């Protein structure tokens, strides 16, 4: 059994695929069609980051279809990874994939991170998603009503309420199959606990109608748990070569800010906050060279470093990709001296890896829910690096510190 995961950002792709890696699957996350050093033909699970979150809906849908064809979607089980806080073009992408892949089993809940679904609407730590800081930061409007959002994209959708999800395997399977025969194209599933997701996974894994799954890391873990892969237990992590760890915080969520503060306080590592105005102007800004030299000097000396983006009155959520790309270019000379990267915010992680010419990640294990640990391919003249990625609004307050610990506890001494 092989899987194709299509995600709209890098941290989501890794977070979704880690469950399979933990079940022993050979799992690769790709940033490009043919990444150097990664043999996709030998992978049990290929997770494609199509980087479509900020695209126009039509362009995002086309990018997903391209990934489906390129990833041999017809011969693999498909998991369409979406953001558990419904950012991006998930509804348009799901509607585009449905004619090819079948009935959409939609369950974005991720209880381990406080994301749940009730009455077909999303909640974050018990609060309606539309009332959360996450939606305010992204300037999103309306209600987080999954059925309505799918219907707005022309997909006939219906709700599978919690009492049906908990009615038992046979009832759940028969209900979903019956809805498909009635012409329903998407089933939106309530879920409050990991047991609810496990029930959905078990009931839908053997449906007698074509189907694919639409969700976050929560449902992906539930689907991966009973899978048997030849690799068995995940391979132990080899000790990385000696060298510093660079932590990039490109997300401006309050959660990421608290995580960065925790990392700084517990490690005492050097930190740098880069004003957005420097990143907007790039190398032409008067302070660019000084900031770049500060980053490079610290990492060249073998010291770990925390770099984050500041905020100002001109902040616009839509400029995230631009700021992330500039942060990557600012950090690139120093990145060459690192052996580890921690990146919070999928756009930040992708920008840094792309700038460094890294097109794939081999997933290893999970630091905590939503924080996977990976290795980059070893290429001629380019040593492998350890990478931890995290969505901006995910994780415990100590998430970055836990990621740093996971990297440094086995770090080999510098030569």
UniProtKB/Swiss-Prot annotation:
EC number: 2.7.1.219
GO terms, molecular function: ATP binding; kinase activity
Enzyme class: transferase
Gene3D superfamilies named in the record: Four-carbon acid sugar kinase, nucleotide binding domain, Putative sugar-binding, N-terminal domain
InterPro entries: 4-carb_acid_sugar_kinase_N, 4-carb_acid_sugar_kinase_N_sf, NBD_C, NBD_C_sf
UniProt key word Nucleotide-binding: yes
Pfam families (UniProt xref): NBD_C (PF17042), SBD_N (PF07005)
Keyword Protein biosynthesis: no
Catalyzed reactions: D-threonate + ATP = 4-O-phospho-D-threonate + ADP + H(+)
Binding residue positions for substrate: 9, 53, 81-84
Gene disruption: observed consequences: Deletion mutant is unable to use D-threonate as a carbon source.
Keyword set, alphabetical order: ATP-binding, Carbohydrate metabolism, Kinase, Nucleotide-binding, Transferase
Residues the record lists as binding ATP: 251, 345-348, 392
Domain of life according to the entry: Bacteria
Family of the protein in this entry: Belongs to the four-carbon acid sugar kinase family.
Job of this protein: Catalyzes the ATP-dependent phosphorylation of D-threonate to D-threonate 4-phosphate. Can also phosphorylate 4-hydroxy-L-threonine, with lower efficiency.
Name by which UniProt lists this protein: D-threonate kinase
Name of the gene encoding the protein in the UniProt record: dtnK
